[in-house]
């Protein structure tokens, strides 16, 4: 992308590649890689000015959800998806450092990219209530973002497990159980990890 956010990601990749090729590749002992995820969602994110936490906060207070750029497409994915990929990559790098050093993407399948409004509608549906209002956006952002995951699929045998609806369902369920049902966050997280391992 040409926006500052996308350019910062590209700059990081260029710098890491330069150091890898200049100082680490010939040693064949230290694996240096970058792993990029899509737009991760999941329970336990309390950061301000982020879509999911803001939605949950509004829903709990029975307030309208304000969104920018409703038609912008993002590769939303449950946070457990790329974490599984990172662990698989770490194991392969330990076994064969030179072969698996490089840049890796752990995103969604091309047909799973979803726009902001659709994502928020899924959140409202699984929560059980809620309203949306479009808010004017004064910041430039890339309209469509997507990661090519073919390399991870081919060489790591990694692939996404959940579609967008299942990812949102798991996310909303975490917040609902913790915030509404007052369940232990650690227990809820453990339950979801077990379910994800079973499903994948």
Go through the PLM ranges and name each one:
Residues 1-4, 25-51, 73, 105:
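Flexible, glycine-rich beta-alpha linker
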Residues 2-33, 56-61:
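Active-site Tyr-X1-5-Lys
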Residues 4, 12, 48, 116, ...:
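Conserved donor sugar-nucleotide recognition element shared by glycan-biosynthetic enzymes
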Residues 19, 52-53, 131-133:
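A generic local structural motif
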Residues 39, 59-200:
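C-terminal substrate-binding subdomain of Rossmann-fold SDR/epimerase-dehydratase oxidoreductases
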Residues 50-53, 122-124:
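Glycine-rich, phosphate-binding/catalytic loops in enzymes
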